[in-house]
Structures are given as structure tokens and as C-alpha cells.
Amino acid sequence: MQLQYFLLIAAALFCIGVYGLVTSRNAVRVLMSIELMLNAVNLNLMAFSNYLDPQEIKGQMFTIFVITIAAAEAAVGLAIVLAIYRNRDTVDMEQFNLLKW
């Protein structure tokens, strides 16, 4: 397949993630939107790696690294959301400003 197809799909995924990030007030949906944006970046990394030098695996290695970091970020984010839900009985983003006190 051509590079343009992968770039269009990645751009669409990234735009959907940004839309979800901006419009959602639910913390779990915000985390899912961030993960969708990271997956769009991973798709770009894989596409450019395959397009520029198909014999090298640097892009694939970096993509696996980003997936690992995203999994850790999701685990920490969900742990924080779960702790706030236990204390406040809501996952509304407006209630997260209570972390300031």
C-alpha cells in the first residue's frame, strides 16, 4: 500500500482522538482518546519506517517502546481515576480540580 493511505488513516485517528479529548468530560473517555492519539502516532512511525527503509527495524522498535509507555500511562491514569471515583463517586473532569487542595 502507499504511504498516503496510512497517513490519511493516522490523521483521521488523531483527529478523532483530539475531538474526544476536547469534548469529553468523562475521565475514562479522555484516557481512551489519548490512547487513540498515541495509536495514530504509532501508525505514522510504522508507515514512515517502512517507506524510508524497509530493511531497518528502528521504527518498529520505537513503536513497541511507545506502546509500552502508553500501557504504563493507561495503568497509572486508570488508577488515579479509580481512586478519585472511590472518594468522589464521579469520574467527571470538573471534579478533578479538587486535587488542588
From Swiss-Prot:
Known catalytic reactions: a plastoquinone + NADH + (n+1) H(+)(in) = a plastoquinol + NAD(+) + n H(+)(out); a plastoquinone + NADPH + (n+1) H(+)(in) = a plastoquinol + NADP(+) + n H(+)(out)
Keyword tags: Membrane, NAD, NADP, Plastoquinone, Quinone, Thylakoid, Translocase, Transmembrane, Transmembrane helix, Transport
GO molecular-function terms, A-Z: oxidoreductase activity, acting on NAD(P)H, quinone or similar compound as acceptor; quinone binding
EC number: 7.1.1.-
GO BP term, example: ATP synthesis coupled electron transport
CC terms in the record's Gene Ontology section: NADH dehydrogenase complex; plasma membrane-derived thylakoid membrane
Broad class of enzyme this protein falls into: translocase
Membrane topology classification: Multi-pass membrane protein
Entry's transmembrane regions: 3-23, 30-50, 64-84
Main location: membrane
Keyword Electron transport: no
Stored InterPro entries: NADH_UbQ_OxRdtase_chain4L/K, NUOK/Mnh_C1-like
Compartments, record wording: Cellular thylakoid membrane
Function recorded in the entry: NDH-1 shuttles electrons from an unknown electron donor, via FMN and iron-sulfur (Fe-S) centers, to quinones in the respiratory and/or the photosynthetic chain. The immediate electron acceptor for the enzyme in this species is believed to be plastoquinone. Couples the redox reaction to proton translocation, and thus conserves the redox energy in a proton gradient. Cyanobacterial NDH-1 also plays a role in inorganic carbon-concentration.
PANTHER family: NADH-UBIQUINONE OXIDOREDUCTASE CHAIN 4L (PTHR11434:SF16), NADH-UBIQUINONE OXIDOREDUCTASE SUBUNIT ND4L (PTHR11434)
Quaternary organization: NDH-1 can be composed of about 15 different subunits; different subcomplexes with different compositions have been identified which probably have different functions.
HAMAP family assigned: NDH1_NuoK (MF_01456)
Family: Belongs to the complex I subunit 4L family.
Protein name: NAD(P)H-quinone oxidoreductase subunit 4L
Gene source species: Leptolyngbya boryana (Plectonema boryanum)
Gene for this chain: ndhE
